[in-house]
Amino acid sequence: MKEEKKRALSRLVLTPVQWERSLALHTSFAIGGPARALVQVVNEEELAEVVQFLRAEDIAWRVIGRGTNLVVADEGYIGVIILLKGDFATISICPPTGKTVAATVGAGISLSRLCKSCQERGLSGLEFMYGIPGTLGGAVIMNAGAWGGEISDVLLGVSLLSADGIVDISSAEMNFSHRAWQDYEERWPNAVILSARFLLRPVGQEVVKSHCDSVMAKRRLAQPIKQPNAGSFFKNPVGESAGRLIDSCGLKGLTFGKVMVSPEHANFVVNTGGGTSADIRNLMKEVQGTVFRETGISLQPEVHFI
């Protein structure tokens, strides 16, 4: 990026822009080369101005949360990475209506902080997300879920920054499937989720805490949490478990370079230290090929490659 464009971009935000920032520092896999720039925006005005500038200058860009579902290329990202901070991490609770409460939550909030805030307020509905790394915006796009629950179960709608400005859409207008908002990229190309609205139930702190503790206990028992990973690597096929299929093919512990199919959970790929994006791709292809040959089922990645 030319110096005059760097200066122009820097003037749009309060937080200093980080140039040639390693994305290994911003992804849960701890893998990936540098982005040309990493920009933090703290409100809708900053975001709108940054996006408008990047579009006008034809500079590639994308918003990420905590990089928990991303595999970044070893050569990095030739563009600008945007992080949602400040106002994007707020929670607004409406007065109760009968047995339910509506909450508006910024897209940049971490799922852990959101769940803890709900616990403090005694609001139930999002406990299944407790312990899922990442931020809310990405969770909505992925229709994140676990232990029988998913975002779409309790979502009322979202606010988006689209090419035409801010748009509010209801969950009834959103086509969700397992781990995906299916028509997001088709209907809203390059749109950014600003916030999401949920319908929750006030049940008391102790009830919510009990649910969260139960979910976390299951995670600690079944999932690797000590090594860098991106959570579930493959989508579960209809009526099947990706982890069970991989395990049945004897692939736990399979290693390429410095990445490995976790011995603890077959649908987790872990970075054992110094892994690369190429290692992950090679491991993925081997797992997909073996599972298809032995079961006839084609596994699709849940993670995104950039």
Swiss-Prot record:
Any GO molecular function: FAD binding
Cofactor: FAD
Role summary: Cell wall formation.
Domain spans labelled FAD-binding PCMH-type: 31-203
CC annotations in GO: cytosol
Active-site residues, record numbering mapped to chain: 179, 232 (proton donor), 302
Entry similarity comment: Belongs to the MurB family.
Keywords: Cell cycle, Cell division, Cell shape, Cell wall biogenesis/degradation, Cytoplasm, FAD, Flavoprotein, NADP, Oxidoreductase, Peptidoglycan synthesis
Reaction it catalyzes: UDP-N-acetyl-alpha-D-muramate + NADP(+) = UDP-N-acetyl-3-O-(1-carboxyvinyl)-alpha-D-glucosamine + NADPH + H(+)
InterPro entries in UniProt: FAD-bd_PCMH, FAD-bd_PCMH-like_sf, FAD-bd_PCMH_sub1, FAD-bd_PCMH_sub2, MurB, MurB_C, MurB_C_sf, Oxid_FAD_bind_N
Database matches in HAMAP family: MurB
Annotated EC: 1.3.1.98
Predominant location category: cytoplasm
Designated name of the protein: UDP-N-acetylenolpyruvoylglucosamine reductase
Coiled coil location: none
Pathway of action: Cell wall biogenesis; peptidoglycan biosynthesis
Gene: murB
Biological source species: Desulfotalea psychrophila (strain LSv54 / DSM 12343)
Position of the signal peptide: none
Record's subcellular location: Cytoplasm
Any one GO BP annotation for this protein: cell division
